[in-house]
Each structure stands twice: as C-alpha cells, then as structure tokens.
C-alpha cells in the first residue's frame, strides 16, 4: 500500500505550510482574531478542499482538508478550529443533505 501523498496533496501541504510560516506565525503574539488571514485562506482555496469545483471547491477531498488542517494547527490551533468549522460544518451539511437550490445558493459563498 502506498502512503505517499499525491502530487496535488503534496502541493497543498506545501502551500499550507508556507502560509502558516509566512502569515500566521509572525502574527501569533497579536492575541486577537485575524479576520484578514481567514479571508486569505478563503482566497487561496483552503476552505474548499473537500468540495467539488461546481461549488467553488478544489476537489482535494477529506485528505486535502486534513492536510491543510494539520499545517494550520502547527501555527495556531485556534485558527485551525475556525478552519475546520468553517470548512466542514455548514457547507458540508448543505452539500450532503440540502436541496439543490440550497446547494447552489449557499455552498460557494461558504467555501
């Protein structure tokens, strides 16, 4: 069994690690909510890892989401919690059990 990351997953790991080192760690002592970092994470596509492209996702699956979660948590566990909640709770629930109209209306804006 091959446990190596795919090229795509290795790339998202590298991007998430770079983001954590360059953007999160230098600001960790601010001890306040970093709304701009959350916006940047959305722009990069981190929140859409587990979602199909038709909803604005990147189709990296749960493994991609977990990889980003791990890299963010190395820098700031609080931001990791926000990432995990924003990226999986409401949008994933709508994707799995929502109506087609709800999916079209909400998911892309949430991820």
Where are these regions (language model features)?
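Generic hydrophobic secondary-structure packing signal
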Residues: 12, 16, 86-89
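Acidic-residue sensor for enzyme active/binding pockets
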Residues: 8, 15, 23, 70-71
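Glycine-rich flavin
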Residues: 24-111
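Intrinsic disorder at enzyme termini
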Residues: 1-12
């Amino acid at each position: 069994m091959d446990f190596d990351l795919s090229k795509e997953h290795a790339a998202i790991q590298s991007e998430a690690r770079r983001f954590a080192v360059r953007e999160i760690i230098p600001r960790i002592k601010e001890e306040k909510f970093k709304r701009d970092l959350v916006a940047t994470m959305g722009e990069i596509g981190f929140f859409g890892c587990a979602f199909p492209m038709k909803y604005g996702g990147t189709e990296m699956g749960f493994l991609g989401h977990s990889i980003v979660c791990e890299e963010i948590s190395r820098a700031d566990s609080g931001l990791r919690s926000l990432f995990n909640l924003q990226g999986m709770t409401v949008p994933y629930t709508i994707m799995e059990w929502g109506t087609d109209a709800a999916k079209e209306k909400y998911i892309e804006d949430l991820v």
